[in-house]
Amino acid sequence: SVFAFENEQSSTIAPARLYK
């Protein structure tokens, strides 16, 4: 997924902005 580069399921939990 675009938002969850680490895990596809992470997209539903939190967007990539949180990881960055």
UniProtKB/Swiss-Prot annotation:
One of its GO terms (biological process) is defense response. Keywords: Pathogenesis-related protein, Plant defense. Residues 1-20 are annotated as: Disordered. It comes from the Eukaryota. Induction: By heavy metal ions. Belongs to the BetVI family. This is Protein PR-L2.
